[in-house]
């Protein structure tokens, strides 16, 4: 092998090394950009939490999923002409100040949407009950408008009391730090708060267990005794212990 061939071979190997280094550098730059974008997003989150006096962050969380997808799609296009794909695990899922919707939007639509979803739930419960009985659901056997409205109103009352108790519990935690506001609520706590009577909740695990069983029986009795009619005898679904009874009226 002459000197010219050796020089060409060395030049080719150097080009290969340089090309691999460029590819590695591009990947590293994309990763750094993704991490930097995530850092900026977390900084916005902390800034928003410090400025906001609200303890209830449900409004921000409401549209976080769609807002996160939108931000991710915006970052996929790069000026160099190739798609910059950012791994989902590198993206923050908590909403930032840019994804907070207008609160007035929920004031006019949340109640109607809730009632609509509750009505769908009542129909599904009725269909499931008929299916367990080996009967096909028909328009005559599904709840009539009055009966459906009654189910929705009862469900709304119970959920509103539960949500009020959850909010009361979070407020009584006392701390205003970000950790207590962002800390997720354990399901066991939520089950305990399900024992709701006029907005109160218990601190006794035994009472909570009894209340859950009592609530289940009350719901089953409500569905059974109602017979798809708009009226119901409340005494038939109440139990002897007044502390753990679940009311169906305000």
UniProtKB/Swiss-Prot annotation:
Task: Extract the GO molecular function terms from the UniProt entry.
Answer: RNA polymerase I general transcription initiation factor activity
Q: Does the keyword Transport apply?
A: no
Q: Name the coiled-coil region(s).
A: none
**Protein location:** Nucleus, Nucleolus
Q: Which UniProt keywords apply?
A: Nucleus, Transcription, Transcription regulation
Q: Which GO terms describe its biological process?
A: signaling; tRNA export from nucleus
Q: What is its main location?
A: nucleus
Annotated region Disordered: the residues are 1-30
A GO-annotated cellular component: RNA polymerase I upstream activating factor complex
State whether it acts alone or in a complex, and with which partners, per the record. Answer: Component of the UAF (upstream activation factor) complex. Interacts with rrn5, rrn7, rrn11 and ssp27.
Q: State the protein's purpose.
A: Component of the UAF (upstream activation factor) complex which interacts with the upstream element of the RNA polymerase I promoter and is required for the proper accumulation of rpa1/nuc1 at rDNAs. Required for nucleolar localization of condensin.
- What family is this protein classified in? Belongs to the RRN9 family.
Q: What is this protein's record name?
A: RNA polymerase I-specific transcription initiation factor RRN9 homolog
Report the source organism: Schizosaccharomyces pombe (strain 972 / ATCC 24843)
